[in-house]
Amino acid sequence: MDWDDEYSHNSFDLHCLLNSFPGDLEFEQIFSDIDEKIEQNAASIKHCIKEIQSEINKQCPGVQLQTTTDCFEWLTNYNYSTSESSFISHGDLIKFFKTLQDLLKNEQNQEEMTLDLLWDLSCHSSVSFPSTLSGTSFHFLSRTSLHSVEDNSSMDVKSMWDDIRLHLRRFLVSKLQSHNEINNSQQKILLKKQCLQQLLFLYPESEVIIKYQNIQNKLLANLLWNCFPSYNRDSNLDVIAHGYQSTMLKLYSVIKEDFNTLCEILAPSSMVKFIKETYLDTVTEEMAKFLENFCELQFRENAVRVVKTSKSSSKHRGAVHALVTTECPQKGRNFSLPLDKVEFLSQLIKSFMKLEKGVQELFDEILLSLKITRDTSGILEKSDREVVMEKPRANETNIPSEQSLPGKEATLLDFGWRSAFKEVSLPMAHCVVTAIEGFSTKILQQEQNERSSAVSYAMNLVNVQQVWQDSHMFPEEEQPKKIGKFCSDIMEKLDTMLPLALACRDDSFQEIRANLVEACCKVATAVLQRLQERAKEVPSKAPLKNLHTYLSTAVYVFQHFKRYDNLMKEMTKKPIFLVLVQRYQEFINTLQFQVTNYCVRVCATSILQDAESHHWDDYKAFYEGERCSFSIQMWHYFCWSLHYDLWTILPPKLAQEILVEVLEKSLSLLASRYARAHPSRKRTPQLRLDVTTILICTENMLWSVCTSVQKLLNPHQHTDDKIFKIHTHCNNLFTTLVILTSPLTELYKTFQHGLDESASDSLKSFFKQPLYWVSCISHFYPSLLRTPSAGGLKAEGQLKLLLSQPRCNWNLLLETLLHHDGLLLRILLKSSKQVSDTENNLNQGPSLMEAIFKILYHCSFSPQTFANVFVSYMEEEQLWDFLYNIPVSTCVEYELEVIRCLRLALTDAIKDTVQQIVSVMSSRRNCETNLNKHIVPDCLLESMPKEWNYSPKETNRKESCKSFTRLTAQAVSIVISKLPTVIACLPPPVKYFFFLSERKMSKKFVELKKAGLLVWNLIVIICRIFEDGNTVELLTGASLDRWSKEKLGLICMCLKSIMGDQTSIHNQMIQKVIQSIEQQKPNWIERQLLKARKLSTECAFMTIEKSTALQEGDVALELTEQKINTMVLDLCHKPGGREYLRQIYHIMQLNEEYLKEQLFSMNSSEEKPLPIRPLKTTLRSIEDQPSAFNPFHVYKAFSENMLDQSAITKWNWNWAKLLPNYLRLDKMTFSVLLKNRWEMKKDETLEEEEKAILEHLKQICTPQNSSASDNIEEQ
């Protein structure tokens, strides 16, 4: 709405767009709203310029401005000093100041009134009050001239003015000091700004800065005194380092407050100078004093130690330097520092670097806002090229723009904290190498002692801590899980020392960094040599598991030094540890090959060497034909033990690479061996059982080595080479099974006419499809693997693939959660109601309901999942009445979790609207408060010079203040105007949810027909926020008085009336407000509500169309890998998004068996569903925690869940269906496999019919027969 008597300034908060992926209609509404606000702002500026133009024409009769350009030119060229002045009686000035002086001395609480009066005289009556102590005369702007007071007694006026200023300064300084006690940062900044602006009105900037600097210096002194611990010989260095870290954090918060306070008051150069002199220089001085005391104590300790040991020979490098007499000068002295002291100094440097980085970021924000470019070398230099223009003072004379403005060199923040470490830098440079080499040698020696004391050495492992969580250099899938303890201890110490190298700038700390880099290289090389030595001990002196540990440890060190290089490249411009990193990379590649090669060799030469099981010529059945070979079982156990070790130690990606390669190569070996097997009649069932067992075991392992559904169901020959080869080997094994073990009569029926060359291409490649072997055994072994043509994975398959991964795969997790319209999430929500109070007390984080809500809320590409999950939940729990009547206060006795989540989501959407309404009300309230509070006394008005033409505000109150009706109408219009844009910026899932919910409720609630359930709830929440003062204060930080609450209450009643509430229909004030809106824009409210409803339903219609298209098989609309990845990235950048995903994954892990049972029950034909059980949400006992690898557990799971060997022998194979698929089998392959059949053995007794069949099959695949048939065709 346009209010002609207002200078409105409208803005659009673009951050709300980041919560969703708006569609075309939403973007159209958002851009329309932005355009409308730009037009309103332009109209407001134009109106303001017209008023200025009119005022100039009125005040200056000789000037007639016709256009906006004329107005700007006149204002730009106007010069106070060249104007004519009218005379003001000197006695009048003395009378006014005398009255003002007496008023301040004799009356209390007149300071605010005085400051407002002086400001009004300066702004509206054009009276200029000097801020300097001397040399300035009072003058005022009349219609035609400027006149300076000149009188021999002018010093009396200046003396009186100085006395008034001094009184006001004391008042303002006292306020400034009291503001430091305020806890609310935003309120403190606002109040400080007001005080400083008032001081700058009275005094020059330099004096104000000095005074404020003194105030802040006292604050800083108290902070340093209370937080900076002192140092002595018995001090705990860890406590001192922690004290400095906490002090730096508090100091940064104080600096940040002053940045925000001064950025709009002072020029950047002045502000930078203030921050530097007040805080940075002071803390540097304090650190210099601390380090001076530290050095003195260290020097004395070294001197005493040297006197005691001077007669004995020194065993440590650098001991000669410690032999310094007490008469040596202070500067340049050297002393040794033990490891704990070097670590302590490194922690101090880290604290300063963190403060430096924070202050630099604050300064960069200011430079960016002022569009000032600067050199990339940081905040530690002074730039001669950059110029920052000083901000104009309110009471200074304007200078024409055509004249060149004098520029000030911008002094960039020069934080010289490194100078405080100058005295200690030389000892640190000398001792850092000794310290690092000393502790690394000690740790390596401890590892050697452990190795020497054990016959079979199993290295001590530690879990890798998540370091550098703010770094995305190495994704989770590449980070090790466990490493050798000795390496962890060494790298932990190096991490502690790293700040010594990172602190290097230009010439400072150069020697320290050089020595540190040299020591790190020596230590890393020693660790590499130790790992190489230990790797050679496998398998003769150490188990295979150690090899995984060495590989994981090498990856850990490699990533550390890559990270070091990345952190130092800003200073060094080139990688420092390049050679070292390359050596580790080569070692990692070698170890990976060694692990893979060793595992394959073990399979080939040991595990699969099974003379008893593979005695294929034996005419006795192997265990009555009801057991597979021992070697196959051992191969299965070996693969799963390897799987366990890789999953618990190595980085997930590397673990899968190794396992898939071992699986592929061992399958290649098995396929080759079984293709060459020539079993007897009694041993042929064993071969069939062996191959079937291999295929079932491989199917079970595939879930672990495939990282996506695409790789699992449709691997590509080039991008998924290893997976594709595994399927090829399995297809070859199954080919062996079919040709070698099928009944001879069935084989003859299929191949009696030869290998059919006329078969189609689809038939030719059918038995070579990746999942062909799975489909062949699925009749007997119901695998969860399903080809895309068969509908892809079910929910059980998605769950199995997700939980088979070595880590939480975010993309796969989200895909599983969204699968089948959130089927798993619906199960979790049902079961979450059964979670015990004990479980809830153990879980201090967000609830499962909140985690599911937050995840689905931001899945903009799958709005139907959010809607279906929560609509079904609301339906089951019968919560529709709560949805119609959402509370806003958190103080309600009991609030359902899903309703609370909805309330918070909608409250966040209308927060900006509430903020704008409260801002309008607060500004109006402040206006009325100032008018009523700061009334100028009559005695002061009477003493005021008439030439000033001052008119009190009270006389223009009716003209300057809006009526009560117009204020309410403006607030209501803001709410209604913002509704469409608020809905446009809501994520599609919540809009579709309210659309479906409205269908459930519309018959019961007639009011919803006007604007829809979503609009209704937004209005209701806004009203209830306004009715609850506590919620308003929490959202906006504004405290409301009785007047504001009454006005907000009236706004609520108007909004309810618009939405159809009949209780306030007879209220005249409400009707008056609504009529005033309608008079300005007829039917505008109704159009806005219809637009909001359209935006809330359009998304729903699009979702319905999409669901229909998917049911009809439109693949383009499915959730592609790219869409899943986009939503995962969006979720991980949302506050708490990663934690919500991890929490759901953790609960799914703990309840895997229960979820499988529920999914199986839903798919079965049983009418009675399984009972709902409470979910496990925490590991409550040792039994729940994963234990070491247990082969008996694997055997039990293998025999009970995967493979019933006796049942497999009774499988009724459908040979008539299987064999025709091999009509285009290669003749050579068919010939070799045919020769290996038991019937081809010389000593086998066959019937005549069987002999004839064999002869016929031989002729089919012999080259002679092939060439003869070719000759016949040519003839």
UniProtKB/Swiss-Prot annotation:
It comes from the Eukaryota. The keyword Metal-binding does not apply. InterPro entries: DUF4495. Keywords: Disease variant. PANTHER family: SIMILAR TO KIAA0825 PROTEIN. It is linked to Polydactyly, postaxial, A10: A form of postaxial polydactyly, a condition characterized by the occurrence of supernumerary digits in the upper and/or lower extremities. In postaxial polydactyly type A, the extra digit is well-formed and articulates with the fifth or a sixth metacarpal/metatarsal. PAPA10 is an autosomal recessive condition characterized by one or more postaxial digits of the hands and/or feet. A rudimentary digit (PAP type B) may also be present. Intrafamilial variability has been observed. This is Uncharacterized protein KIAA0825. It comes from Homo sapiens. The gene is KIAA0825.
